[in-house]
Amino acid sequence: MYNFKEVEKKWQDYWEKNKTFKTDGYDFSKPKFYALDMFPYPSGVGLHAGHPEGYTATDVVCRMKRMQGFNVLHPMGYDSFGLPAEQYAIQTGNHPAIFTNENIKTFGKQLRSLGFSYDWDREISTSDPKYYKWTQWIFKRLFEDGYAKYIDMPVNWCEELGTVLSNDEVIDGKSERGGFPVVRKNMKQWVIDIPKYAEKLLEGLDELDWPESTKEIQRNWIGKSTGVEVKFDIKDGGEFKIYTTCIETIYGITFMVLAPENPLVDELKTRIKNWDEVVKYREETAKKSDIDRTELNKDKNGVVLEGIYAINPVNNKEVPVYLGDFVLASYGTGAVMAVPSHDQRDFEYAVKYNIPMIQVIEGRDTKESAFEKQDYLGKECKLINSEEFTGLTVEEAKKAITKKLVDEGKGEEKTNYRLREWIFARQRYWGEPVPIIHLEDGRSIAISDEDLPLVLPTLDDYQGKNGKAPLENDPDWVNVEVDGVKGRRETSTMPGSAGSSWYFLRYIDPHNDECFADPELLKHWMPVDLYVGGPEHAVGHLLYSRMWNEYLYDKGLVPVKEPFKKLVHQGMILGSNGLKMGKRFPKYCINPSDIIRDFGADTLRLYEMFMGPLDADKPWNDDAVVGAKKFIDRVYRLYTEDNKISDKENKNLDKIYNQTVKKVTNDYESLNINTAISQMMIFINAVQKEDVFPREYAEGFIKLLNPLCPHVTEELWKVLGHNNTIAYEKWPTYDDSKIVDETYEMVVQVNSKVRGKINVSTDTSDEEMKKLAKEIDNVKTFMEGKEVVKEIVVPKKLVNIVVK
């Protein structure tokens, strides 16, 4: 009977005592492999069922890579600063520092109980002054180079949390943490000028082995566009600018829209006849988040600025000016031209307020809906009602109208980005202090490097009141003097995203007090070869960390532009009811510690990897957990009770063994771990039908299973007569000559007519078959100059390529 509790504790103690997985960072003799998990926030509830999924996947690859002769860096730490810890502390009456340190101990214990092969000597936490010394050091460089700025700007303010939130922390007008209402207000705020890196961040995406969906999310968030910035005069004095990518529609303008918070509105106050109505509308708008305001499906609303008219620069026609909450002062120029015949949002606004419409591009009627650019671009549509430009195609008109505006000094070509500044301060306690002093003479200066880290003071009262930051409660810490000039320390703290924006660099040299990491080590270990974590970080952490790394690269402080070479997202582990685990359905929540207690860590690891593809969402199944445990028990009995292991050969197992080594190796490499497990189960079934299990194959199989089930395989390695750990044994190899697959001929058709034949084996994938088919010269001839509409594979019969 396999006693998993005894065996798992035994080997965890062994690994800890012998520092089995300690990485010699300076061993450059071996090829390197740096695998990274998105480090957890150490919450009070400990690990949840989703944590082991991604962590096990990276551990599987790391254990294989060690056996393949790689020097593996596989660290772990804690994203321990930020709102979650502080909110929990307030709710429970604990101090966030005490609470966080206790949770880190709990997390560390739970992670060790899962048998992960982390180098625990590299453990970090973002709330450790030895760590955030370097977070502050990097911020200081950003400040000195003009990327960290202290500016007045509209921000997302959450009264309940008492702090500013970044756009990615606001969901449907509420805070991501706690679901509290968020409003817009103007505040003096620290920001990182990430838009300056917009083009570099876009270019870098092309070279990354990341999910295409994540790259596309970042491209859309950055939002690059090319267009024209046009100056509009205001009747009786004044002007403003708009930016448009549809300059061809400028003759169709029937009104203009300003952002409610646009400063121009205040300048026009004395000329606006319905000022009280304007004030009321602006107050209502301030209660909405940017996301709420720009939601396409929302009801369009606004207010006209009575007495204010803009003059269209191409025909000098006067058009009314409105306020509309869908226009943001922080995006573009804070003003837009409205062409209701060719923009659906403008169309709905015009219908609501009975504003005239002018169609300026032919193609279809615009009485029921707008004829938008996605409908007319590239279709040789021509302009109408556009004076001298009438009759030109859209593409011709774009160039001609732009030239006219530029020549007359009324416009200029411009590239814009949707990406906004990264708000880099929170009016909260539990975060890195910002190493800046505001002096009475108006200067803001960074403290010296010798004074880093600027340690977060211990406060009994760590709750801010009336919008004031908690650090205001410690006047002895706040009030300072520099060269005889009085000043005040910055009392906002950095956001939770600060420490996570560079932690992958610190793991490489975590105890260095002279620099954030030895340049020689950075050159060897960067970039991260495999990064596993959730897709929800696409426009937060994954964008911010790329920007910080790019900045450090430009400074010559890191050797690579991009930090994460390959990114994989694990799917969500759902409750057995098929829904997300959480407070709403407590009986469907799974605690990993319970599974480890009842079935063992190896069972949990094996089960979570066998649930399905790593990137898919998967419902929990208690019966399948039992099934995983039974498989481990079967393997244990095979090695300890069945007396089949022998130095004799068994030709019957040659093919299945070599197939298994090949498939498991390839599947681990590609993170198709569930299919690797299926193959190992097939192999064990085959072995149990035989009387002889050759020792070479028995040892090879244990090595294959080790990355998934490290405890039982260490024990069985010992049963096989070895006294050393299996962790650094040589990975099994396979003999292709013993993998004799059935081959067969398949017909290749183009538009259902035979154009060639290919020979394939039983393990040739559909994609490989399509590729082979398209490499046939005769097939190429019939495909030339045509678009592939569909590719059909009928197993063991044919490949049909449909073209037009």
Language-model regions, residue ranges each:
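NTP-handling and nucleic-acid-processing catalytic cores
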Residues: Y2-Q12, A49, T135-E362, Q463-V478, ...
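Glycine- and acidic
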Residues: M38-L47, D119-I124, L328-V336, L383-E387, ...
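Conserved phosphate/anionic-ligand binding catalytic regions in large, soluble enzymes, centered on
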Residues: F240-N262, W422, R428-W430, V434, ...
